[in-house]
Structure formats: structure tokens, C-alpha cells
Amino acid sequence: MWFLILFLALSLGGIDAAPPVQSQVDCENSQPWHVAVYRFNKYQCGGVLLDRNWVLTAAHCYNDKYQVWLGKNNFLEDEPSDQHRLVSKAIPHPDFNMSLLNEHTPQPEDDYSNDLMLLRLSKPADITDVVKPITLPTEEPKLGSTCLASGWGSTTPIKFKYPDDLQCVNLKLLPNEDCDKAHEMKVTDAMLCAGEMDGGSYTCEHDSGGPLICDGILQGITSWGPEPCGEPTEPSVYTKLIKFSSWIRETMANNP
């Protein structure tokens, strides 16, 4: 079984991923670009602030009523750093197969390439110590890099448990062949493979759309992985952003 790191079971939703308790690293206020994407008042996915007006997330996180929270660490507390924004425009990548989202049961031939989407905020974000954009990559990530994934996804692989605070986990950037061997679904050159081959470090349910930062550089966003999460020899898959830098920049420029 596979899951998009949100819930493919949702009619308008996606897939999600989360880090395990034993592999967490301190995350509070260290990821000022991390964004919480909601459908109505329910948390759905992570996202990444690219500039004051734009958030990047996964295309499988598409929904019909977005709300975005920036500067947030704890879901249960009203924090002084919180910024709430609506979304004026959602632009999934034109080559992402949106038909995969409508109560679709994942199949071995499914191709989740191009799993990214831009959200234009209805009001620009205020840049503060805990709300800051991150730049797009300008070069390929290096295999073996230490990567950091973050999110509010499940910290347990089967009976999902969700943290109050933003969680981070260190993962290793692996050859795509490792994911291709581990999974039946297609792994393409528009994807990255990251995890720990002995398990225990992973993204999971509701981490979708969150950042994958390798050697300090944004290189991916969480896309899909195995179910249950964190299985040994079954790393997760991330959208490879260097492949989409031109589309992202052009789309932002053409939608001022």
C-alpha cells in the first residue's frame, strides 16, 4: 500500500508524512519558511514560503477552500508570531495528473510526477524573525546529503498520532534506484528519494507539501511514500524542485 503524504481517501485531498519520535531534532522557530495549509479550518498539508506573496506545496494538496498559517509552531496555542492568510489563487503544475486525487486507489502504474502547486496569498506575509521565505535551489542536490524534513504529520506509522508542535527529522538523500526497487509506483527523474534504509526516520501522514532541505538548501517537497510509514528499505519520495525552478519563477512573475 502507498499513501500520498496526505489522504488519497479524501475527495480533494492528498498525502502526508511525519517524523518519528526517536529521530526528531529540535525544530522550534528553526523553520521560518514552513507553512500550515488548511482546508476550511482543518489542517491538511505543509507548505513553503517562497516570497511574501507565494507558498509552494504539493499538487495533491489541492482543495476548494484554502487557509494558510505562517509563523506557527504549536497548533493548540494562539502564538504572537501567528499570521493568517487566505489564498487568492491556486496553481497546480499543469502536468500533474489531478485525476489521481478523486477517490483514486493507488495503482502500480500511477505516476505522481509534477506534484507541486503554487498558492498566491490574498495579503502579503509580514517578514519577521519567525516568518521568512526560502530561496529555490540553483544546483542539483548531492547523493548522501543530510536532509531535514519538517511537518505536523503523524509521529507513529500505523495508529496515527499528531504532534502539537512542528517536528523535524534528518533523512539521507538516496539514489532514486533505492526508491524504484522499494516501490511499485513510478519513480522518475522529477523526484528525490530520501530516508533511512534501516527505517525509523521518515515522513508520514499529513507531512505532504512540507520542505526537504539538503545541506541547508531547499531541494524538495514531501510527496508520497509507503504505508505504513518508515518501513525498513522503503524510503519516501519528494518532488525534485531543481526540475521546476523555471516554471515556479515564471508562474509567480506572470501572476502578480
Swiss-Prot record:
Alphabetical UniProt keywords: Disulfide bond, Growth factor, Metal-binding, Serine protease homolog, Signal, Zinc
GO biological process, any: small GTPase-mediated signal transduction
Superkingdom: Eukaryota
Domain Peptidase S1, first and last residues per copy: 18-253
PTM comment, free text: The presence of Gln-24 prevents cleavage of the activation peptide, which remains attached at the amino end of the mature alpha chain.
Requisite cofactors: Zn(2+)
Entry-linked CDD domains: Tryp_SPc
Signal peptide: 1-17
Residues holding Zn(2+): 77, 84
Name by which UniProt lists this protein: Kallikrein 1-related peptidase-like b4
